[in-house]
Amino acid sequence: MTTIKVKENEPFEVAMRRFKRTIEKTGLLTELRAREFYEKPTAERKRKLAAAVKRTYKRLRSQLLPPKLY
């Protein structure tokens, strides 16, 4: 479990921001969202494959030269 110690005379907003940052670094929220509902193994594989294809196309697009505008 993630905990932070609130320092003396520290505003609540600053402590909340530090807490959110630590939660984000641990990846807890993304895991909670992923585990919120059951996902069939086939659906998970399909989602991961689609993400991999999208990453590949994005990488290829950044390597290609832009089209000529004349």
From Swiss-Prot:
GO CC terms, sorted: ribonucleoprotein complex; ribosome
Pfam name, any one: Ribosomal_S21
Recorded coiled-coil stretches: none
InterPro entries per UniProt: Ribosomal_bS21, Ribosomal_bS21_sf
Matching Gene3D superfamilies: Ribosomal protein S8
UniProtKB keywords: Ribonucleoprotein, Ribosomal protein
Any single biological process term in GO: translation
Source organism, top-level taxon: Bacteria
Keyword Ribonucleoprotein: yes
Molecular function via GO: structural constituent of ribosome
Protein family membership: Belongs to the bacterial ribosomal protein bS21 family.
Name under which the protein is recorded: Small ribosomal subunit protein bS21
Species per Swiss-Prot/TrEMBL record: Nitrosospira multiformis (strain ATCC 25196 / NCIMB 11849 / C 71)
Gene: rpsU
